[in-house]
Design a protein with these regions (language model features):
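Conserved lysine of the Walker
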Residues: 24
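Glycine-rich phosphate-binding loop used to anchor ATP phosphates in small-molecule kinases
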Residues: 60-126
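Extreme N-terminal, non-catalytic leader segments
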Residues: 1-12
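NTP-dependent small-molecule kinase module
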Residues: 146-154, 162-221
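A glycine- and Lys/Arg-enriched "phosphate-lid" helix/loop adjacent to the NTP-binding pocket
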Residues: 98-169
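Hydrophobic anchor at the beta1->P-loop junction of P-loop NTPases
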Residues: 16
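Conserved substrate/cofactor phosphate-moiety recognition/catalytic segment
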Residues: 29, 33-71
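P-loop (Walker A) phosphate-binding loop of NTP-binding proteins
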Residues: 19
Length: 221
């Protein structure tokens, strides 16, 4: 796939979303290279509470969630300080995911505190021109998590992933803020398989509005 210039990109802000291990960041990196665009990534390795959270979720859920909230808010403020129309950007998260994870990991008292902080931050996130929601079965997520080899993820709880997957499905069932492409990423390899990636890119460049579903043809390459 030849690289395109930023001026040829079909969207100014593309966001990739989906549960842990589905391939958001890898796809975001490749799209950014294709379009010559700025890459906005969640910096999970900077969160000092994340490893503790995976060992004992109840002991560090609030700290881990607030760290991500502040980190994401800073990144979005940086975007707002620049003219969104002058730069093509690809991101591997929606700010709305912050509340999604908070609902899943915090108890009622913690969530009430989190919600107060979120409200006071008055997060004003730019609206994406396209959101790509990657889906895959939990078994596939676990395989990919094991394969990428991040130490603190290696004991990821299956039940947690199942709940996370359900939360994403509910969220995107109602999502209407941007054009949405829902992709079955169970068997596709958008990083190493050129056919898989090219076919997805064709879908991305065609979408201007509405909700779309894409089930990649199994590659014979």
């Amino acid at each position: 796939m030849s690289e395109k210039s930023a001026s040829s990109a079909p969207h100014r802000l593309i966001v990739i979303e989906g549960p842990i291990g589905v391939g958001k960041t890898s796809l975001a990196r490749r799209l950014a290279r294709s379009f010559g665009s700025e890459l906005i990534l969640e910096q999970a390795d900077e969160n000092p509470f994340l490893e503790r959270f995976y060992r004992n979720p109840r002991a560090a859920a609030l700290q881990a969630q607030l760290f991500f909230l502040f980190q994401r808010t800073r990144q979005l403020e940086d975007i707002r300080q620049h003219d969104l129309f002058d730069t093509v950007r690809v991101a591997d998260y929606l700010i709305e995911k912050d509340r999604l994870f908070a609902r899943l990991t915090l108890d009622d008292e913690e969530y009430a505190l989190y919600d107060q902080i979120y409200t006071r931050l008055a997060v004003d996130a730019p609206v994406p021109d396209l959101v790509i929601y990657l889906q895959a079965p939990v078994d596939t997520l676990l395989e990919r998590i094991e394969r990428r080899g991040i130490r603190y993820e290696q004991h990821m709880d299956r039940v947690y992933l199942e709940k996370l997957q359900e939360a994403y499905a509910r969220f995107f069932h109602e999502y209407a803020a941007s054009p949405l492409l829902i992709v079955n990423a169970a068997q596709a390899d958008f990083v190493s398989n050129e056919q898989d990636y090219t076919q997805l890119l064709e879908q991305i460049t065609r979408i201007r509005r509405g909700r779309h579903f894409y089930n990649p043809l199994k590659s014979t390459l």
